[in-house]
Amino acid sequence: MKMSNMLVGTLREVPAEAEIESHKLMLRAGLMRKMAAGIYNYMPLGLKVIENVKNIVREEMNNAGAQEFLASALIPAELWQESGRWDAYGAEMFRLKDRHNRDFCLGPTHEEVFTDIVRNEIKSYKQLPLNLYQIQTKYRDERRPRFGVMRSREFIMKDGYSFDKDQEGLDLAYEKMRKAYVNIFNRCGLDAKAVAADSGAIGGSGSAEFMVKSEVGEDDVVFCTACDYAANIEKAPSTPEHAEKEELMEVEKVETPAVKSIEDLAKFFECSPKKIAKTLIFQADDKVVAVVLRGDREANEVKIANAIGEVIELEMASEEAVKEATGAAVGFAGPMGIKVDILLVDQEVANMYNFIIGANETDMHLKNVNYGRDFEGIVGDFRNVTIGEKCPECGKEITISRGTEVGHIFKLGTKYSESMGATFIDEDGKAKPFIMGCYGIGVTRTVASIIEQHNDENGIIWPLEVAPYHVSVIPANVKNEEQATKAEEIYNELRKMGVEALLDDRKERAGVKFKDSELMGIPMRITVGKMIGEGQVEFKLRNGGEVETLSIEEVYNRVRKEFERENLSL
């Protein structure tokens, strides 16, 4: 491609809306342009990268025995109602009606569609196993779109589904997909790790996320310092810290005027936050739920939602709801006598002695409270783990890092096949539900994650296999006929070799062209300058290294060498 013919617009200034490096660079390098909040148009350069990632995904999925097809993005409500998710998915689903007043949605995910296709097409165990996938645009009405394509309302995703006759078949399909995902992310140049995860709204049992470590990641990921254990913090079990046993004392009401925060309470009572139990009140659809945690702990909303069961939306209760539940101002809630539908008590609180709680009375707290004697609830693990707690597998210490999810694999089991009546006839002539697996990759999020891991102060540094162009050929002075002619000859020869080459034939200064080539992340640069009269050009790698002066024939071999180094063929 010649840049004089390209729709490309690089930006020198960082757009005010962009918060993270990938968002900044995707806009500055001309990969995409914003149309509305969380909605982007992909420019030619960005689309080439997306297509390269798609091709990697296709190759690895096909190699693992999966078949590609394309489902409709517009889905009738009936399918979602069959699975019970039409109401369960919540406000993130884009819903619409056709001219006949029939309900539809723009697909945020496609379990129901795939299940419907397979129940109509597959009748016998002889037609199994089956693994289908598609690469398609998905739609989710995010409450707060941010970070560019990391959390957008429209995004490209590969979603695949396996159908087996038994658990053994599912386990095999799941492992094939896990290996395929490892290959995909390695080829994309990503340092990604599979971690244990919660199944969320998708449902099912076994689940793993492929996480990319990132300082701006939206997820906290728990890693063991000694073994291979890794899990999303939503999933990681906490290790309760047992308090020293004490003789139970009588409950005492204490006036605490305007003392609401844990920090202020600890100062007021001259105690550690570990001696305080805080009561958080949530609205879980139509239920009011109170959760009691040790004062220094953070609530884990996924664990809480799982304990409640079938929750569409979980959020902190309004001030009005808190007052109705406690009869007091916000900041004085406690588990004794609270009026809620469900009371959850973290296992750590159940093992504390003589602790402090809100009295459900404005400006009042209770001390010397003990679980079992003074109140009871559903005891469980409802908090986030913290650095230094014990690994659930080896007992050594854990650490926590930020991460971005780029892929997710699930063992769905029969969740959808049973609810939608999707069955096959087994060897004994009996109807049985398909055993399903689900496998997703965020294609556009993967592109952004590659940029997050591969950039410097000058711009993007694309890994060779995903780069929009492999080589940028730059005539230093397009007005110099010899430079312009030789640059085009080199460009044409590279294309004959199978190299994606970009000829910067714009009437711009060489410095502008160099900056744009670096900003766009082109892995190799060949400059045709004053030394062309001696048959020599300059070669430079985007990811570092010195400028090399080579003959024209040598530069072709140098390009080949980079492909060989990356195990790529021409």
From Swiss-Prot:
Q: What is its EC number?
A: 6.1.1.15
| Keyword match Transport | no
Sorted keywords for this record are:
Aminoacyl-tRNA synthetase, ATP-binding, Cytoplasm, Ligase, Nucleotide-binding, Protein biosynthesis
Give the reactions, separated by semicolons, that this protein catalyses.
tRNA(Pro) + L-proline + ATP = L-prolyl-tRNA(Pro) + AMP + diphosphate
A Gene Ontology biological process noted in the UniProt record is: prolyl-tRNA aminoacylation
Task: Give the function comment from the record.
Answer: Catalyzes the attachment of proline to tRNA(Pro) in a two-step reaction: proline is first activated by ATP to form Pro-AMP and then transferred to the acceptor end of tRNA(Pro). As ProRS can inadvertently accommodate and process non-cognate amino acids such as alanine and cysteine, to avoid such errors it has two additional distinct editing activities against alanine. One activity is designated as 'pretransfer' editing and involves the tRNA(Pro)-independent hydrolysis of activated Ala-AMP.
**Protein name per Swiss-Prot or TrEMBL:** Proline--tRNA ligase
- UniProt lists the gene as proS
